[in-house]
Design a protein with these regions (language model features):
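Conserved beta-strand hairpin/beta-sheet module of binuclear metal-dependent hydrolase folds
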Residues: 2-47, 120-132
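Core dinuclear metal-dependent hydrolase active-site scaffold
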Residues: 7, 18, 98-124, 128-129, ...
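A short acidic, helix-capping loop that chelates divalent metal ions and anchors anionic groups
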Residues: 84-87, 138-144, 177
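Accessory terminal helices/loops
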Residues: 156-166, 175-255
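Active-site metal-binding loops of divalent metal-dependent hydrolases
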Residues: 32-33, 57, 81-82, 114-115, ...
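Divalent metal-coordination and catalytic microenvironments
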Residues: 19, 31, 56, 68, ...
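Active-site-adjacent loop/tail segments of enzyme domains
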Residues: 139-165
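Active-site HxH/HxHxD metal-binding segment of metal-dependent hydrolases
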Residues: 27, 34-110, 127, 193-197
Length: 255
């Protein structure tokens, strides 16, 4: 089995993703921020859309679903929780479910916090994680519907995946994430290296994803809230990791 992944920009800073099964020619869009760029990418590759795998109900992730469904009659897969907020759903999934895209297998991880219905899709064979707005490169999503312990627990689920997995996230926020992270984790050598890489990529107008999950574990301060050095930097020595994470997220909200 082999998969091809295409990345492109949707809306202002959303990422659009297509994952294509070479064997069966099945193609899934991970979320559908808007139809236009997805249609162009499909046309450019000569692919037919068979599935849309939705991560959560926010409009900037489902805005193109209706038009794509009408054109391709593709299957729409969405979280079971609050599924009524998402139109045209064919299959509702929960934690541990496996979704087939041709011969490719996507494992569902419930990762609530950003929204209560948020899920991530893990393609274990392809060592690929689509984390949408739960985990960003050098950052994480805002916590709109859940709470900080819930979001921290979701990040721990993603952190538990192997280091060689590729992270594909929902938005191109990496440069601003790096800027914030350096204010709270300035001596982190891995973060410094990632900052230099991101500066170069953005100067060349290239996306900063995918990133390797192992690199994120070393450089992303939001994945390191349980490390004593991070708590000490925030003057929270001995504090619960979820509380440290919450303080990091509050500071990022204000940055």
């Amino acid at each position: 089995m082999a998969a091809e992944i295409r990345t492109f920009t949707c809306l202002n800073d959303n990422f659009g993703y297509l994952i294509h099964d070479v064997e069966t020619k099945a193609t899934a869009s991970i979320d559908a921020p808007e139809a236009g760029p997805i249609l162009k990418a499909l046309e450019r590759e000569g692919w037919q859309l068979t599935d849309i795998l939705i991560t959560h109900h926010h409009g900037d992730h489902v805005g193109g679903v209706a038009e794509l469904k009408q054109k391709y009659n593709c299957r729409v897969v969405a979280p079971h929780d609050k599924a009524a907020k998402i139109a045209n759903v064919d299959l509702r999934v929960a934690n541990g479910d496996v979704v087939k895209v041709g011969s490719l297998l996507a494992r569902v991880l419930e990762t609530p916090g950003h929204t209560l219905d948020h899920i991530s899709y893990v393609f274990d064979t392809e060592k690929t994680l689509f984390a949408a707005d739960t985990l960003f490169s050098i950052g994480c999503g805002r916590v709109f519907e859940g709470d900080y312990p819930m979001m921290w627990d979701s990040l721990l689920k993603l952190r538990a995946l192997p280091d060689d997995f590729k992270l594909y996230c929902g938005h191109e926020y990496t440069a601003s994430n790096v800027k914030f992270a350096l204010t709270v984790d300035p001596d982190n050598v891995a973060l410094q290296a990632r900052a230099a890489e991101v500066t170069k990529l953005r100067a060349e107008n290239k996306p900063t994803i995918p990133s390797l999950l192992g690199d994120e574990k070393r450089a992303n301060v939001f994945l390191r809230a349980d490390e004593p050095s991070v708590a000490a930097r925030l003057h929270m020595k001995g504090a619960d990791a979820a509380a440290v994470f919450g303080e990091l997220r509050e500071r990022k909200n204000k940055s």
